UniProtKB/Swiss-Prot annotation:
GO biological process terms, semicolon-separated: cell differentiation; male meiotic nuclear division; negative regulation of DNA-templated transcription; piRNA processing; regulation of miRNA-mediated gene silencing; spermatogenesis
Protein's organism: Aedes aegypti (Yellowfever mosquito)
Protein name in UniProt: Protein maelstrom homolog
Region spans: Disordered: 436-455
Keyword field: Cytoplasm, Developmental protein, Differentiation, DNA-binding, Meiosis, Nucleus, RNA-mediated gene silencing
Residue range(s) of DNA binding per entry: 4-75
Similarity-based family: Belongs to the maelstrom family.
Name of encoding gene: mael
Pfam families: HMG_box_2 (PF09011), Maelstrom (PF13017)
Length: 520
C-alpha cells in the first residue's frame, strides 16, 4: 500500500503560493515540490506570526472540508494528480510551441523565396556533473550561425569555470570528464567565471535585442535539450533577468527543412518521418573530422566530444542533405569539411532536360521546378554485363526485373533433352517406330538441338534399322535383327541384348526372327 500523504499544514500552502509567484517571473522547478520546499524554506523562516496566520487559516479551512472522494488524490509515489496533469499539459503546450515556431520560420522563408537565407543557431554544451535538482554544471558552450546558402556564418566558443562543484559531486565530475570531453574540473577548470559575461556574449552573438518580442530559437540535439535549458536558466537566475529562449530539438527542425527543400528539386518524399532525420544525426558521418574543434580539443586529439565540433558537424549533415535540392554550390569549410572534394557535387548540378537533350529548359517536366541531380543527372551509370540485367533505360541505368528470362546459350544446351534411350521400341506394319513425336525442321532435326559426338542416339537408331520387315511385338521382348555382318558387329557394341544375337549368323538377309517373352 502506498504511504498516506502527510497532512497539509501552513507551510504547504505557502509553498504553493511561492511556486506560483516564482513561475510567473519565469523561474522553473525541474526538481518538483522537493526543489520548491528547499527554496521556500528560507523565505518561510523570515515570516513573522502575523504573516503566517494567513496560511494557518488556509490549512484549518482545508481540514474542515468534508472527507469525501472529491478531495485531492495522489499517485503511488505521493504526487498529486493535479500536479501530474499540470506537467503533462505544460509539456504538450511546449511541443505545440516548438512545432508552430518551426512552421512559421520555414513558411515565412518560402513565401519570401529566401529559404536558403534562413538563419538559425545551433548550440551545444558540455557539463561537469548533474545535481539532484536536475541542474547541470556547465563546462563548455559552442554556438554557430548557419544558413543553407553560405553554410557556417559565424562561431562562438567559450569555456566556463564554475569555480566550485556541488558538495559530494567532485568524483562524479572527474569520472565524467575523463570519459568524455576531458576538460579539467574545478578548482583547476579553465574559462570564464562570470555568468553575466557569458550571457552577454550569447545575446550579442544572436543579436537578441533585434527581436525582443519573440523567444530566441536555438537548435540542439534532442539529448542536449535539458542541458541547454538548464544552462540558459542558470544564466538568467545569476543576472536576475528574464531573457526568453526556446530550445528546439535539431531533428525536428532538420525534418521540416528537408521536406521544404525537397519541393524545389524532387517529386517524391525521401524523409517520410522525423525518424530519418534523427538517424542521420545519430549516425554522425563527420564525427572524426579534424580541424573543426577548439584549440584545446585539437591539441588533445579529442575532437569527437568538443562542443564546437558538434555544432559544425550538424551543419555539415544538413548541408549535405538539403543544399543539392536548391542547387546551392557547396563551399568546402562551410558546407562540408575543408578537405572535401566538391567537384562531383558541381557536376551533379549540370542537368539535362528529359524532353529535349539538345535544348534544356532547366525545368522538370513533372513539377515545373529546377532540375537537380535527383531528376536527371548527366553522370550516367556504366551498363552492367550481367545476364540477369536485360531491361535497360535510356540513361544507361539497369533495372532489375523478376519477369526477365535469362538469355540461353545455344551451344551449351543439351542435345537430347527428351531423347529416349530405351532400344526396345515396337515397330508397326508400316515400319514406323512408336516414339514420342517432336516437331522437326526441314532437315529432319528437332528445333533447339545440335550434334553431340558423345551421344548414343545415332548408334541406337542404326541398331533399329531396317524397317521394311513384318516384325511386331511389345517392344520389351522383341528386337529386329538381321544377318548382316556389319549389323552384327554394330549390335555387339549397342548395349543390352547384344549377347543374345551374337551367334545368329545363319539367318538370311530376307528372313526375320521374332523372340517374345509371352511366347508359349
Amino acid at each position: 500500500m502506498p504511504k498516506k500523504p502527510a497532512a497539509k499544514g501552513p507551510f504547504f500552502f505557502f509553498m504553493l503560493e511561492f511556486r506560483r509567484r516564482e513561475e510567473s517571473r519565469g523561474k522553473s522547478f525541474p526538481g518538483g515540490m522537493d526543489q520548491v520546499m528547499r527554496e521556500a524554506g528560507p523565505h518561510w523562516n523570515q515570516l513573522n506570526e502575523a504573516e503566517r496566520e494567513v496560511y494557518k487559516d488556509r490549512a484549518k479551512s482545508y481540514k474542515e472540508l468534508p472527507k469525501q472522494n472529491y478531495g485531492e488524490k495522489y499517485t503511488a509515489q505521493g504526487i498529486a494528480f493535479s500536479q501530474v496533469e499540470m506537467e503533462k499539459q505544460q509539456l504538450l503546450k511546449k511541443h505545440e510551441t516548438i512545432r508552430k515556431t518551426i512552421s512559421e520560420m520555414i513558411q515565412t522563408a518560402v513565401l519570401n523565396n529566401a529559404l536558403e537565407k534562413l538563419e538559425v543557431f545551433f548550440m551545444s554544451c558540455n557539463y561537469f556533473c548533474k545535481t539532484s535538482t536536475e541542474a547541470f554544471v556547465p563546462a563548455e558552450i559552442a554556438l554557430i550561425k548557419y544558413n543553407l546558402e553560405l553554410g557556417v556564418l559565424d562561431k562562438l566558443h567559450e569555456l566556463i569555470n564554475p569555480v566550485r562543484l556541488p558538495l559530494g559531486l567532485a568524483h562524479e565530475a572527474l569520472t565524467y570528464s575523463e570519459q568524455t570531453h576531458e576538460l579539467p574540473t574545478p578548482p583547476n577548470a579553465m574559462g570564464e567565471t562570470d555568468f553575466y559575461t557569458v550571457l552577454q556574449k550569447i545575446l550579442s552573438f544572436t543579436d537578441y535585442n533585434s527581436k525582443p518580442h519573440k523567444k530566441l530559437a536555438i537548435m540542439t540535439d534532442a539529448k542536449e535539450v535539458p542541458v541547454i535549458e538548464s544552462l540558459l536558466s542558470q544564466l538568467n537566475d545569476d543576472v536576475k533577468l528574464e531573457y526568453q529562449f526556446l530550445v528546439i530539438p535539431l531533428g525536428e527542425f532538420f525534418f521540416h527543412l528537408k521536406r521544404a527543400t525537397e519541393k524545389y528539386g524532387l517529386d517524391i518524399c525521401t524523409f517520410p518521418t522525423k525518424t530519418v532525420a534523427d538517424i542521420l544525426l545519430k549516425k554522425d558521418a563527420y564525427e572524426y573530422t579534424s580541424g573543426i574543434a577548439c584549440d584545446f580539443h585539437e591539441k588533445l586529439g579529442n575532437q569527437r566530444f568538443c562542443a564546437l565540433s558538434k555544432v559544425v558537424r550538424w551543419s555539415y549533415i544538413i548541408s549535405d542533405n538539403c543544399c543539392l535540392d536548391l542547387s546551392i554550390d557547396l563551399i568546402a569549410g562551410r558546407h562540408l569539411p575543408s578537405n572535401a572534394d566538391t567537384t562531383l557535387c558541381s557536376d551533379l548540378y549540370e542537368t539535362t532536360s528529359k524532353t529535349n537533350q539538345s535544348q534544356s529548359d532547366g525545368m522538370s517536366f513533372v513539377s515545373s521546378s529546377e532540375l537537380t541531380h535527383f531528376t536527371l543527372p548527366k553522370i550516367q551509370k556504366v551498363q552492367s554485363k550481367s545476364a540477369f540485367r536485360s531491361v535497360e533505360d535510356k540513361n544507361g541505368s539497369v533495372i532489375y526485373s523478376s519477369r526477365t528470362v535469362p538469355k540461353k546459350d545455344v551451344k551449351t544446351e543439351t542435345t537430347e533433352p527428351h531423347a529416349p534411350i530405351n532400344p526396345f521400341y515396337m515397330v508397326d506394319g508400316n515400319d514406323s517406330v512408336y516414339a514420342p513425336s517432336y516437331p522437326t525442321k526441314s532437315n529432319g532435326t528437332r528445333p533447339g538441338t545440335s550434334y553431340n559426338p558423345f551421344s548414343r542416339q545415332k548408334k541406337l537408331d542404326e541398331v533399329r534399322e531396317p524397317h521394311g520387315l513384318d516384325v511386331k511385338g511389345k517392344g520389351r521382348g522383341t528386337l529386329l535383327v538381321t544377318a548382316n555382318n556389319s549389323f552384327s558387329s554394330m549390335l555387339k557394341g549397342a548395349g543390352r541384348g547384344s549377347g543374345l544375337f551374337a551367334g545368329l549368323s545363319s539367318v538370311g538377309s530376307n528372313s526375320s526372327v521374332r523372340l517374345s517373352d509371352d511366347e508359349n
